[in-house]
Structures are given as C-alpha cells and as structure tokens.
Amino acid sequence: MDLGTEIKSDTRQEEQRHVFEDYPEPLRYTTWVLRVSIHCEGCKRKIKKILSKIDGVYTTNIDVKQQKVTVIGNVEPEILIKKIMKAGRHAELWPTSMENNINNDCNYQKKPKKDNEETSGDEDDDENNNNNNGGGDVGGGGGGGGGNFDQVKQVVTFVNGQLQPQGDGAPKKKKKKKKKKKSLGNTTVVMEGGGGGGGGGGPPQNDGPPETVIYSAPQDHHIIHGPPPHLHHHQQQNHPYPTVHSPPRHHPQQMYGPGPGLPPPSFYHTQPQTAPSYTVSYNTVHGPINNGGNETASYYTAPPSHPTSYYSYEYVDTGYESPPPEFYSYRSQPSESFESLSEGNPNSCCVM
C-alpha cells in the first residue's frame, strides 16, 4: 500500500511541474496631454474625479497655471474629451512634439527657398555691376586714345535764335541734350545744346538754352582772345540782319591768309601746308568799297537766297594771295556796339 501511494504522489508532482501558469498580458499605457479650461481648485478636483472614473485611466496630473492635464492609461483621447465636455468644460488635445517637429520642418523648407532667391538676386546685381564697370573701362580706353597731345580748350556760347550750321535736308530737333565730338585734324570740336539744332533748310529756332562750342588745339598753338561772349550776344540782338551796301569781295566760304606784317584775325589760325586744318567762324565779313565817293561798310551780310549760318566750318589754304588792305581796315559800325566791343582795339573780333 505504501508503494502505491508513493507512486501516485510522484506522478502528481511531475504533472504539477509540467503545468505552466497563465500570466496576464502587460497593459499598454499611453500618455495623453489635454488642454482643459481650469479656473480654480474646485475645477481641478472635479476634472480629476471625472477622469479617474473612466476605465483604463491609470494616473492623472493637472497643472492649473498652464491648464494642462496629463493622463496615463489605456484609453483613447476622444473618450477623455467627451467626458470632460459633458461636465461643461472645454477640452482639446495639446500640440505634441511631433506636430511641432513637422511645423519646424516646413519652416526649414521654406527658408532655403527665400535664401536661394536672395542669393540669386545678389548674383544678378553683381553681374550687372561688373558689366557696367567693364563698359566704363572700355570708354576710358577710348578716351585715352585721343590724348596724344595736351588740348587747349576754348568755349564759345551763342544763342539759338541765330542761324544754325548749314546742312542738307529738313530741320531736325534734338529732344535730349547730346554731346557731339568732331575731330578735324588736330582740332576737336564739342557741341552742347538742349534746343533745336537743324540743317540749313530751316528757319532759326529760339527753343532751349544757349549752345556751347568747345574746340581745342595743340599746346603750342597761339589763341587770340577777344571780348567775352555775352557782348557778342548783345550785339547780335541789336542788329540781327542789317542791310548790305556793297557786293562781296570774295566767296563767303573762302578766307585769306595772313597779310604781311599784320596780325591774323581771332577766328583764323594758320597750319602747315602739309596738314590743312579747319576753323570755326560765326559770321561772314566783307571789306568796305567805294560807292560814289562815299565810303560805307556793313558789318553783317544779308541772308542770301540759300540760308547761311553764323556757325560754319571754313577751309584755310595758305596758298591764296593775301587780302587787300581794306580787309583789315577800320570798319564803321554803330556807336553802341563799337563801345561795347572795342576795348581799345578797333580790329578786335566780335566773338573771341
């Protein structure tokens, strides 16, 4: 009997060893953060009591200052919000760190685009500046090419009411101020003006400020200075087109060389025969002749059939014969203009 009972007890013990105990599954807790309107300690106790009665809530933590409620448990956040809303309190999910990270990523993606646009705009500005600097260098080089000799510049101003330089075609108007440089041999002429300049076919125009003519010569060239330009302007206003009492003695566009022992006029200068030059004159002057024993002279010529200009380019050839003495003789003119232009020299030029 004893043996049988012992065998049974051993088998039972072995069965108990092979039986595995069933352990419960671990709870999956999650943390939810809610924003709840909490005004006082009474609201805090009421919300904590409501949340503790919900199945699956393990712990609750309430921060009154931030109105922040932290719930740890195995429950969905929608259930928590519904329970709190039924109690008459507003509740919503607190923005989590994941959402903040997503927003930060979006902002980070927007910033590089703006930075790229700014950098591209800066590069365009740099390229434009480089192009402008390059153009200035080229222009400076072009200006340096003409500096073979020192230039002596002389400025003469005349009013646009006078006739303009000759030309073929209809009159032209300049809308903007422009500068023109014309190099004639060793002489450089610069014309500035804002009014209407035109060819010989148009009437004189009174639009715009006075025009300025700058012409230069080599440093060793002698320039004779005459009365200031404003005196010439005053004289031309008083006597725009006087009458002519004598026929011309030479062609209007031809000028004589310097006479023996006499100084050349201010608008005239000589050049070597191998390199003829061009000069600028503003009027056509004729010497006096005898008409019936009365010696008369006209300082200006009447406008011919084709319009002429007080501003013209003259060709000078030293091979021509010298003019007669009457060309350099004293010319009678109105007392007012003579007194304003003489300055002790009866043969002084009215322009230079």
From Swiss-Prot:
Lipid-binding residues (covalent, S-farnesyl cysteine): C349
SUPFAM superfamilies: HMA, heavy metal-associated domain (SSF55008)
Metal-binding keyword on record: yes
Start-end of Acidic residues biased regions: 118-128
Disulfide bonding pattern of the chain: none
Compositionally skewed regions (Basic residues) per UniProt: 172-183
Compositionally biased region (Gly residues): 133-148, 192-203
GO molecular function: metal ion binding
Propeptide: 350-352
InterPro entries: HMA_dom, HMA_dom_sf
Biased composition (Polar residues): 97-107
Keywords tagged on the record: Lipoprotein, Metal-binding, Methylation, Prenylation
Modified residues (Cysteine methyl ester): C349
Pfam family, any one: HMA
Domain HMA: 29-92
Function summary: Heavy-metal-binding protein.
PANTHER family: F15K9.8-RELATED, HEAVY METAL-ASSOCIATED ISOPRENYLATED PLANT PROTEIN 33-RELATED
Similarity comment: family membership: Belongs to the HIPP family.
Protein name, UniProt field: Heavy metal-associated isoprenylated plant protein 36
